[in-house]
Amino acid sequence: MSQSTSVFRRNGFTFKQFFVAHDRCAMKVGTDGILLGAWAPVAGVKRCLDIGAGSGLLALMLAQRTDDSVMIDAVELESEAAAQAQENINQSPWAERINVHTADILQWITQQTVRFDLVISNPPYYQQGVECATPQREQARYTTTLDHPSLLTCAAECITEEGFFCVVLPEQIGNGFTELALSMGWHLRLRTDVAENEARLPHRVLLAFSPQAGECFSDRLVIRGPDQNYSEAYTALTQAFYLFM
């Protein structure tokens, strides 16, 4: 697939090294996922787990950022999304390194014996409320099929002692998620609050937890500068992926 033909495809998102089709996925490629995939710490990792893989975006970003020896498991409950993730991965340079599993993570995790150095998730965060257009979108948006305590428990069952569990959430929900994680024995090690520009309050938060205690590093990321162009910090974080950066 050449860049000249793929850049104009309307059913997905073209990155520098791969294309993500998402027309059969409830949740499309967006800034949240791109932020998380570019931000999650990958130094020294040997095995990664993507919980709720959707289109396969995070798994593909991690594959681009890591050595050829790193293996990635991507677990997705919804069959159409999992099938599209598999197609996206098959067309990428890293098909041999990413395994897609169509499964409920709560059941899948009980069958695993390996431990992961990095567990990553762009999780649902809405409580049950206004109906979505499709059951698939409701599943992707609401915590009914995977609530936050269950997500934290799943990650705890399969992570290495020095590993990181990374999520992206709305700011206020992220604060509650952090309190819950700490009460369950996790340690917050990295936190980046994300604002659209300097004048606005943070609207998203990137969080990295570990079973191992240690210093917590916190910072703030502004997506756009005063001229409305991408900020230097956001560009530095994501330029390996965005096509025209």
From Swiss-Prot:
Signal peptide extent: none
Catalyzed reactions: adenosine(37) in tRNA1(Val) + S-adenosyl-L-methionine = N(6)-methyladenosine(37) in tRNA1(Val) + S-adenosyl-L-homocysteine + H(+)
GO molecular function: nucleic acid binding; tRNA (adenine-N6)-methyltransferase activity
InterPro entries membership: DNA_methylase_N6_adenine_CS, SAM-dependent_MTases_sf, Small_mtfrase_dom, tRNA_Adenine-N(6)_MTase, tRNA_adenine-N6_MeTrfase
Gene Ontology cellular component annotations, sorted alphabetically: cytoplasm
Enzyme Commission number(s): 2.1.1.223
GO biological processes: methylation; tRNA processing
SUPFAM superfamilies linked: S-adenosyl-L-methionine-dependent methyltransferases (SSF53335)
Protein keywords: Cytoplasm, Methyltransferase, S-adenosyl-L-methionine, Transferase, tRNA processing
Location in the cell: Cytoplasm
Pfam families in the cross-refs: MTS
HAMAP family: tRNA_methyltr_YfiC
Assigned protein family: Belongs to the methyltransferase superfamily. tRNA (adenine-N(6)-)-methyltransferase family.
Function: Specifically methylates the adenine in position 37 of tRNA(1)(Val) (anticodon cmo5UAC).
The protein's name: tRNA1(Val) (adenine(37)-N6)-methyltransferase
Species annotation: Escherichia coli O81 (strain ED1a)
Gene: yfiC
